[in-house]
Amino acid sequence: MSEHTFGQPRALGVGAFGEVGNRVFVLQITGDLETLTLKAEKTQLAALAEWLGSVVKAGGRPGHLPDDFAVTLPYDIAFVIGDIAVAHDEDENVIDVRITSPDESDETSFTLTPEVAGGLAIAITRAVEAGRPPCPLCG
């Protein structure tokens, strides 16, 4: 089993690459010693964003939300995301994220402050919605 533990990452990236309908979604975690890029389904990232957003919202408006969540290129996919487990540690006021591959042979974990979680939720939402055509009624 390959395990990657980051604590609080130095950087996070999220992006979608390719043509609409065939896009590859990635989540990138950078620590002091390594950068790990994971392939995700759009629905997995959307669910993560929704959960992070709800936790941040429940805790009240956090401080400054970072907005730099660009993926560092080029990248190599370390593994495909199977399950994402998220827990809010209320005592420490952090969000713990654990991601495993479908066969559970690979795993990574990292911790987010409410500010980083809020910024990441926004970045994920932007990446997920970027390929959608504009609504003909909304413009």
Where are these regions (language model features)?
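Positively charged, low-complexity terminal tracts
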Residues: 1-139
